[in-house]
From Swiss-Prot:
Region spans: Zinc finger loop: 289-318
Disulfide pattern: 168-191
Residues listed as glycosylation sites in the UniProt record: 172, 209
Recorded GO CC terms: cytosol; extracellular space; Golgi apparatus; Golgi membrane; nucleoplasm; rough endoplasmic reticulum; sarcolemma; skeletal muscle myofibril
Entry binding sites for Zn(2+): 289, 296, 317-318
Subunit: Homodimer; disulfide-linked. Tetramer. Forms a complex composed of FKRP, FKTN/fukutin, and RXYLT1/TMEM5. Also exists as large multimeric protein complexes. May interact with the dystrophin-glycoprotein complex (DGC).
Protein name according to UniProt: Ribitol 5-phosphate transferase FKRP
């Protein structure tokens, strides 16, 4: 069938109209405001990086300037500003589809996905940009992407030209010891962590596979998690500009931000199970228990504290309290003329490495029963609990006829004092517990007592303490460490 000229013209007109409609529709789906906001145009494939702004103070910030600086470089740049709750005063953010505010705290009237930051990120890469940074040079994010792809590090970073630019650090995180240790980076600019202001870029899948991807302070939480996984960060020879109107410009604003930042950091470290931070130069920061708080663990069942089931050892703050209590108690006993010696697991720790066993939760000392009357605190404890001038609590233990010295009224980390007396050349006592090492022994192990380093001081110990320990625990006990109740949890089987 042949087409007439009229039919051919009609078909051509319909085809042309369809092409025009398709083109108009395509234009409508392009980013608005391609009104010469900046010198660069979006690549044909679209942006590969989402700018994520998390670290800022709601009461004083330069977030609008930060966001605008990235949009100047690329009007289609995806930007997510993340906050726990709606910032107040409100942020003056542009009302365009590629700039979004993510509220991370769950709310009754919002779906679960709304509080998950990954909901807002559709790009392969994420750039964590701190408040006070500004994008002035074109192509910085793309250069960071290329550096990440070309190198072996899982993160790359570019310092921000503020008063506190990023510096490279080594970081070792030991969950078992509840400790983070910072030091000089031996292979800078390849680092374990950064201290200071930097834009950090990584793959979105890596960021959102972390257990707390946007916990604040972002720098602290991010690098604790990445260093634990062995992910390096490469500090690049690129620099982001500082804000033209920097945040926290007044002394009051800086004071408020520092105060809230310290509280936020302490809460984060406690939540992540870090009780001690060690810095280069020997400075220590403690985030665990003290005399005014309770200890870090609850009642011990079956001689196996809860932290052992978590594949952790005694928190360092608890070990510090035990060392302090042991040193103090030994000083009181020596001043009063009470003969004492390291007992049980405490003697075992001293024999192994001169300290408390890393998973132990108390200190044991034996004393001569006949010397109890020499010590004012022990005499007082016979009648009831005594709090001395240093805040230590001396009391008779409820479990039996022995004494206990607690770190404080709040914190019940303690030293147990076991009164022994000689009978026919054998040391015995009136209270026995269901422990293998709780047995009688010949008095000749105490004649004489010998000095032995323990927990930062020198304590008295039985002579021939190896034989003494093997009598109580069995052969090879010094060389073969084991948890206190292997039937419940074995050191070799705990992972």
């Amino acid at each position: 069938m042949r087409l007439t000229r009229c039919q051919a013209a009609l078909a051509a007109a319909i085809t042309l109209n369809l092409l025009v409609l398709f083109y108009v529709s395509w234009l409508q789906h392009q980013p608005r405001n391609s009104r010469a906001r900046g010198p660069r145009r979006a690549s044909a494939a679209g942006p590969r990086v989402t700018v994520l702004v998390r670290e800022f103070e709601a009461f004083d910030n330069a977030v609008p300037e930060l966001v605008d600086s990235f949009l100047q470089q690329d009007p289609a740049q995806p930007v997510v500003v993340a906050a726990d709750t709606l910032p107040y005063p409100p942020l003056a953010l542009p009302r365009i589809p590629n700039v979004r505010l993510a509220l991370l705290q769950p709310a009754l009237d919002r779906p679960a996905a709304a509080s998950r930051p990954e909901t807002y990120v559709a790009t392969e890469f994420v750039a964590l940009v701190p408040d006070g940074a500004r994008a002035e040079a074109p192509g910085l994010l793309e250069r960071m992407v290329e550096a990440l792809r070309a190198g072996s590090a899982r993160l790359v970073a570019a310092p921000v030209a503020t008063a506190n630019p990023a510096r490279c650090l080594a970081l070792n995180v030991s969950l078992r010891e509840w400790t983070a240790r910072y030091g000089a980076a031996p292979a800078a600019p390849r680092c374990d962590a950064l201290d200071g202001d930097a834009v950090v870029l990584l793959r979105a899948r890596d960021l959102f596979n972390l257990s707390a991807p946007l916990a604040r302070p972002v720098g602290t939480s991010l690098f604790l998690q990445t260093a634990l996984r062995g992910w390096a960060v490469q500090l690049l020879d690129l620099t982001f500009a500082a804000a033209r109107q920097p945040p926290l410009a007044t002394a009051h604003a800086r004071w408020k931000a520092e105060r809230e930042g310290r509280a936020r950091r302490a809460a984060l470290l406690r939540a992540l199970g870090i009780r001690l931070v060690s810095w280069e130069g020997g400075r220590l920061e403690w985030f665990g228990c003290n005399k005014e708080t309770t200890r870090c663990f609850g009642t011990v069942v079956g001689d196996t504290p809860a932290y052992l089931y978590e594949e952790r050892w005694t928190p360092p703050c608890c070990l510090r309290a035990l060392r302090e209590t042991a040193r103090y108690v030994v000083g009181v006993l020596e001043a009063a003329g009470v003969r004492y010696w390291l007992e049980g697991g405490s003697l075992l720790g001293a024999a192994r490495h001169g300290d408390i066993i890393p998973w132990d939760y108390d200190v044991d000392l034996g004393i001569y029963l006949e010397d109890v009357g020499n010590c004012e605190q022990l005499r007082g404890a016979e009648a009831g609990s005594v709090v001395d001038e240093r805040g230590f609590v001396w009391e008779k233990a409820v479990e039996g006829d022995f004494f206990r010295v607690q770190y404080s009224e709040s914190n019940h980390l303690h030293v147990d004092l076991w009164p022994f007396y000689p009978r026919n050349g054998v040391m015995t006592k009136d209270t026995w517990l269901d422990h293998r090492q709780d047995v009688e022994f010949p008095e000749h192990f105490l004649q004489p007592l010998v000095p032995l380093p323990f927990a930062g001081f020198v304590a008295q110990a039985p002579n021939n303490y190896r034989r003494f320990l093997e009598l109580k625990f069995g052969p090879g006990v010094i060389e073969n460490p084991q948890y206190p109740n292997p039937a419940l949890l074995s050191l070799t089987g705990s992972g």
